[in-house]
């Protein structure tokens, strides 16, 4: 504690801890409350949500105005410098007839910080943790031949954000 007091950038957090008498239960509760408020603010700023419902997951949504981003990679290195918030990614793909009715494995590599992943407008998974690999299963009942759309809502709360890792980990 005494050492951290000497380091720039810790004063505000240490003052909060002092106010809570360094009680771990109270500190965790305060942290969770602060994080919840912050996430709520992010959601309000998210143009891909309308009345807390995702509007950019529809398979027939026009992508004409969307920009491309090279993945994997942090978005700060791909045109979104110093950005914390929500970014939506979409990818269209063709499902061959031999895959109909079979569960599919989806590997998104690592995502910083959180994601909600949709397949053809249906939420299939949520993940959290900036160094946690995301491997999901697309349920067999959703797998139909033809065009399919994968939409991923990525939230970043600080530092670098995005779908990152190794290219061979995305499949």
Can you say where each PLM-predicted feature lies in the sequence?
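Short strand-edge motifs at loop-to-beta-strand transitions and within beta-strands
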Residues: 89-91, 132-136
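An acidic-aromatic loop/edge-strand motif
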Residues: 1-77, 130, 142-171
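Aromatic-lined ligand-binding clefts that engage carbohydrates, nucleic acids, or primary amines
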Residues: 58, 66, 93, 99-121, ...
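Short, hydrophobic beta-strand segments
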Residues: 138-140
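Non-catalytic, beta-strand-enriched accessory regions in extracellular/secretory proteins
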Residues: 81-93
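Short hydrophobic beta-strand segments in globular cytosolic domains
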Residues: 124-125
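Short solvent-exposed loop/turn micro-motifs enriched in small/polar/acidic residues
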Residues: 86, 108-110, 129
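Surface-exposed coil/turn segments at beta-strand junctions on protein surfaces, enriched
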Residues: 82-84, 99-100, 129-131, 143-145
């Amino acid at each position: 504690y005494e050492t951290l007091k000497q380091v720039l950038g810790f004063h505000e957090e240490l003052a909060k801890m002092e106010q809570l008498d360094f009680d771990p239960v109270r500190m965790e509760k305060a942290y969770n409350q602060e994080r919840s408020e912050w996430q709520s603010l992010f959601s309000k700023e998210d143009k891909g949500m309308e009345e807390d419902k995702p509007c950019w997951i529809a398979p027939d949504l026009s992508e004409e105005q969307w920009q491309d981003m090279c993945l994997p990679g942090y978005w700060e290195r791909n045109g979104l410098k110093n950005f914390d918030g929500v970014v939506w990614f979409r990818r269209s793909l063709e499902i061959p007839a031999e895959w109909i009715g079979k569960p599919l494995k989806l590997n998104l590599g690592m995502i910083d910080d959180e994601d909600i992943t949709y397949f053809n407008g249906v939420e299939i998974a949520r993940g959290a943790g900036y160094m946690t690999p995301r491997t999901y299963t697309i349920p067999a009942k959703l797998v139909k031949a033809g065009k399919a759309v994968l939409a991923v809502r990525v939230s970043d709360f600080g530092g670098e954000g995005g779908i990152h890792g190794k290219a061979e980990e995305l499949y």
